[in-house]
């Protein structure tokens, strides 16, 4: 599992992203969810460990979100899950801020989120790199 944290300073939002997650990582995800105020971690974490899956949880009161992207079977499946969960994140933020769903402000947030996540996500968008990252994540999980 690879962790990433970033802020969206203009709106005071914190984002915690977990990549290459499998079922063994559920405890870490649950702790982060509780830290941002999630009271139903069992329900939120139900699908963690399934290939090509993810989940995004947002607590608007604390202006914080947790994004989970599971292990994927291919680079294009990663791209699909990444876009899907990133879309949920942006929609959660936009709804809370009352932004027009077809307006520029939502797209500026989406662009900023993409830029922040790209530094990690890029290594999963290439099939060779994705396989190496999955192997590295498993090594870290087992030996560190």
Which ranges hold each PLM region?
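Non-catalytic terminal regions of proteins
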Residues: 1-48
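Beta-strand-rich cores of mature extracytoplasmic or soluble domains
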Residues: 5-6, 26, 50-53, 73, ...
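Active-site scaffold of zinc-dependent metalloenzymes
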Residues: 33-76, 92
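Active-site recognition of the HExxH zinc-binding catalytic motif
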Residues: 80-92
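Long terminal regulatory regions of eukaryotic proteins
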Residues: 133-134
């Amino acid at each position: 599992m690879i962790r990433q944290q970033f802020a969206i300073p203009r709106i005071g939002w914190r984002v915690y992203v977990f990549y290459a997650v499998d079922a063994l990582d559920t405890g870490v995800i649950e702790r982060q969810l509780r830290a941002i105020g999630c009271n139903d971690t069992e329900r939120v974490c139900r699908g963690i460990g399934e290939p090509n899956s993810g989940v995004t949880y947002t607590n608007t009161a604390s202006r914080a979100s947790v994004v989970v992207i599971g292990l994927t079977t291919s680079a294009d499946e990663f791209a699909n899950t990444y876009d899907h969960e990133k879309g949920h994140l942006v929609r959660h933020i936009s709804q809370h801020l009352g932004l027009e769903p077809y307006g520029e402000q939502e797209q500026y947030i989406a662009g900023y989120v993409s830029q922040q996540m790209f530094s990690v996500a890029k290594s999963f968008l290439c099939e060779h790199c994705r396989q190496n990252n999955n192997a590295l994540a498993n090594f870290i999980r087992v030996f560190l």
